[in-house]
């Protein structure tokens, strides 16, 4: 497989995306049925960097190729990767799993929902990034999640992040331990100017929570 860009106006990161041999075989069969010389697939992410992120694939005839796409040449077809989607497709794997009903194409993209932040990002953007990239993956194991409500400049306590816990974290009796030892520590490590982290969620209301 070779990787190239079709134009110099492309993203700086080279896509680290894998299409497994079984997926290549399956896609080759689909593309062959299109009867279009040079047809390939285009890979992109809708709503990248958000909880609603969705990885997508579409047919791409030669005349439909976007000039800024990255091109990955596989033995039987080309794959074109949407340049703005590249950071969200790092370490992505497209696979095909056969079963008695035929099979299923799967798309695993661990970075598709992780927000990207630059050097000029606001503190809200930086906090959201840490929550999505570092904290929520751990909370997900307990069926929980955490989101930023707001950042307050408290006269008494300084810069304060107000968080909302949901899912399995809502109603959890160990929330104080979780918040103080885990979430707050991690946020302060990444954002030194943050002085305090507080929980907006009322953990006395266990209805709708996984842990009661």
From Swiss-Prot:
Gene3D superfamilies: Fe-S cluster assembly (FSCA), HesB-like domain. Its cofactor is [4Fe-4S] cluster. One of its GO terms (biological process) is protein maturation. One of its GO terms (molecular function) is iron ion binding. It comes from the Bacteria. Keywords: 4Fe-4S, Iron, Iron-sulfur, Metal-binding. Pfam families: Fe-S_biosyn, NifU. [4Fe-4S] cluster binds at residues 169, 172. SUPFAM superfamilies: Fe-S cluster assembly (FSCA) domain-like (SSF117916), HesB-like domain (SSF89360). InterPro entries: Fe/S_biogenesis_protein_NfuA, FeS_biogenesis, FSCA_dom_sf, HesB-like_dom_sf, NIF_FeS_clus_asmbl_NifU_C. Binds 1 [4Fe-4S] cluster per subunit. The cluster is presumably bound at the interface of two monomers. Involved in iron-sulfur cluster biogenesis. Binds a 4Fe-4S cluster, can transfer this cluster to apoproteins, and thereby intervenes in the maturation of Fe/S proteins. Could also act as a scaffold/chaperone for damaged Fe/S proteins. Homodimer. Belongs to the NfuA family. PANTHER family: FE_S BIOGENESIS PROTEIN NFUA, IRON-SULFUR CLUSTER SCAFFOLD PROTEIN NFU-RELATED. This is Fe/S biogenesis protein NfuA. It comes from Acinetobacter baumannii (strain ATCC 17978 / DSM 105126 / CIP 53.77 / LMG 1025 / NCDC KC755 / 5377).
């Amino acid at each position: 497989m070779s990787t190239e860009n079709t134009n110099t106006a492309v993203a700086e990161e080279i896509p680290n995306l894998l299409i497994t041999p079984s997926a290549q075989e399956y896609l080759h069969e689909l593309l062959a049925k299109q009867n279009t010389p040079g047809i390939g697939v285009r890979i992109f992410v809708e709503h990248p960097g958000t909880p609603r992120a969705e990885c997508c694939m579409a047919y791409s005839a030669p005349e439909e190729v976007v000039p800024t796409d990255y091109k990955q040449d596989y033995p039987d077809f080309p794959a074109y990767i949407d340049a703005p989607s590249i950071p969200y497709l790092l370490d992505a794997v497209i696979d095909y799993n056969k079963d008695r009903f035929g099979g299923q194409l799967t798309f695993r993209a661990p970075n598709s929902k992780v927000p990207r932040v630059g050097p000029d990002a606001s503190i809200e953007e930086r906090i959201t990034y840490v929550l999505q990239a570092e904290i929520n993956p751990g909370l997900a194991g307990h069926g929980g999640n955490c989101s930023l409500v707001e950042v307050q400049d408290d006269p008494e306590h300084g810069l304060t992040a107000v968080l909302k816990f949901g899912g399995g974290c809502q109603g959890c009796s160990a929330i104080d331990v979780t918040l103080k030892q885990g979430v707050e520590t991690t946020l302060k490590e990444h954002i030194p100017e943050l002085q305090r982290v507080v929980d907006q969620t009322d953990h006395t209301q266990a209805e709708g929570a996984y842990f009661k």
